Amino acid sequence: MTLLKLIEFRRKGIGFVIFAFVIAILNLSAMTVYSAETEKASGGGESLVKCIAGELFAEFYVAPNSVTLMSLADGKIQKIFVSKPTPLFTLWLRQMDVSNRTDYPVSSTNGWRKVSAVETASGFEFRFLEPEEATLTNVSVKVVLTADKSESSLHWKIEVENQSAIYALRNVVFPYLNLSDPGKGVALFPRGPGEVQQNVWSGDFHYHGNYPGGWCSMQFVAAYSADQNPSGLYIGYHNPTGSTKHIDIRNIALGKEARVLKIVFETPAANFDTAGNDFSLNGEVVWKLFRGDWFDAAKIYRSWVVREAKWYPHGEKFKDGLRQDTPEWMRNLDVWVMTSGSPQEVVPRVKEFRKLIDAPVGFHWYNWHQIPFDNDYPHYFPAKTNFAEAVAELQKNDVYVMPYINGRLWDTRDKGTNDWQFSSVALSAATKQENGQPFVESYGSKEVNGEPVRLAVMCPTTKLWQNKVKEIVLNLLKTNGTRAVYIDQIAAAPPVLCADKSHNHPAGGGSWWNEGYWQMLEDIRRVKPENSALTTECNGEPFIRWMDGYLTWHWQHNGQVPAFPAIYGGAIQMFGRAYRGGVTKDLAFRMKAAQQLVFGEQLGWFEPDLASQPQNLEFLKRIVKTRSLIRSFFNSGEMARPPRLEGEIPTVKADWQWSGEWWVTTSALFNGAWQLGKETVLIFANVSEQTTKATLHLERGDYGMIETNANLKIIKNGVDSRETKIFLPFRENKFY
């Protein structure tokens, strides 16, 4: 082991270390082998079925009318993940031929007349026939389990055949797990960039996420132990088109014994308002044993995303490790500001910030239009007086202008308090509830008479809405000369279950929502100016290929980890946090900026006046300069495991004011690691008022290091140094 002792991280200082190592890599390719070791213990029409996938052991109880998961365990160290009887699935069906429609649950653990478990070459096939409910006789389910011995993983598929003339399949709950505490248990779930919470098996814990969206950005979760024998279970819904689904994780009590963590994925069925609709899982569900933490779980998901996800950029779009269709100016931005108002109000302030920061700046411009915010959408034009001239002036000074528009909403009273074009033009393309009424949302904006503004959610599959958004975007890029357009809510708000049969999609679930936006954005990208960019709000993953940037302003929670950047770093630019006020605003400013840096995000999205304050400007200039020297790692590289630091490192706590008071506690010493080819950059940022000391532990093999010579470069507070030859021994020596 080598100990690199970092002597001091001074007050508000940021020290950065770049290691360059020459390593030989031997690429081995091997065919994936699917295999399962199985055992059956039968008696009285019942059997106990065991499926062994490498070191992951599963046991099922099969009865004439049910199948139950009895246990799931790490066979190597005898760590139990599931010890309480758990259903494989639950179906929710609705009787459609009665006025008082009620949803009926049917699970794998009861309610079937015929159940079978057939052993296959690589696992099992479970079949469920003839539900005991007399009117459900034409519903059957097939669940296929495949064991991958080499990966210690179980792969699941489910198909529901519904030949009922009166029942519609509404939702499929699959997978379904009741996880026992693995010992010092930790849960990773996909809110924002990914969030890790401890002690979730005790107390009152509940996470509910609607995918895809900013608060449920990915299709996987993980639970693992943080003790000396790390063992974890990765649960991934590997759906390559990102169909709408809900992830629910909650702490529940099963009887009088220890509490369990109930994890379910609930998927709305396509054509959920029509009797006789079927369901087939597009892709597969994966349970995989891993030994590590959130970073290892993220890498499992990344491996699948790069290989199969329809939204991941490939080919000419992502060549030589670089997102080629994103303009160079967008890739190379290091800092953003945002503000609101007329050209006279915003131009002097933004230009002054550009002068102070001495770097190119991205500018997110709100309220450039004459209509009020969140009102009279989508009638943004005419813009405020001299808007185009202001755009030209700012961009002449290396300020890249990105105006706000909404990509999802049409005001139901779209000319003051009058219904101007909504009913006559837009209503046919609005999303509809099953009763035929449009889905309508309100966000706090008011009409002149004090009533809430009611905004209809538009259906992205309709040509009317696709063409309207395209018209607005091209007006801004071509007529007004902006370098980017921000299209709000696309990667933030989850799909609504539109039931309008005149639209070109099945009612309810499926991936049609994503595919509608893909077509819209593809059409825009095909005709937009080559050097322009498209961005949107938050980081719901299925739109990455069609966007150049995600506004990650909502990454504001305790316990958040950079799982999303570990998966998508370089595939899209992530920028922006909400920077706000309060008595701890300066500390919160440093915490957010430092976290953005180590996460690989472009910095800022603050008001120019806040960032220009003397107590913030010095720190910001250092961190922007440092990012400019290492941005190639974020654009073309890949996140590596954050370095392991030891010592008496203090914590800091500040009110981030995300929603009222919003206290966030972090380490005072932020750190991260990124790799590009044979080089690794280790990043450290001290945000506290005191000098902080820490010890960095490096094991043989970390960051590709072997016992050899290496080049060391240190960038401190944005100041580069010459490379120095060093030797890194990995026995009992220490390098200081």
Task: Give, region by region, the residue ranges found by the protein language model.
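Acidic (Asp/Glu-rich), glycine- and aromatic
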Residues: 150-206, 689-695, 700-701
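Active-site neighborhood of glycoside hydrolase catalytic domains
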Residues: 457-547, 559
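Conserved structural scaffold segments of CAZyme catalytic domains across common CAZy folds
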Residues: 111, 120, 132-135, 162, ...
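Active-site-proximal substrate-binding groove within the catalytic cores of carbohydrate-active enzymes
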Residues: 72, 278-284, 513-709, 716
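Acidic-aromatic substrate-binding/catalytic surfaces of carbohydrate-active enzymes
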Residues: 46-134, 185, 296-302
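C-terminal beta-strand-rich structural cap/linker in extracellular carbohydrate-active enzymes
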Residues: 713-736
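Active-site-adjacent "subsite" loops/lids of carbohydrate-active enzymes
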Residues: 386, 400-475, 479, 557, ...
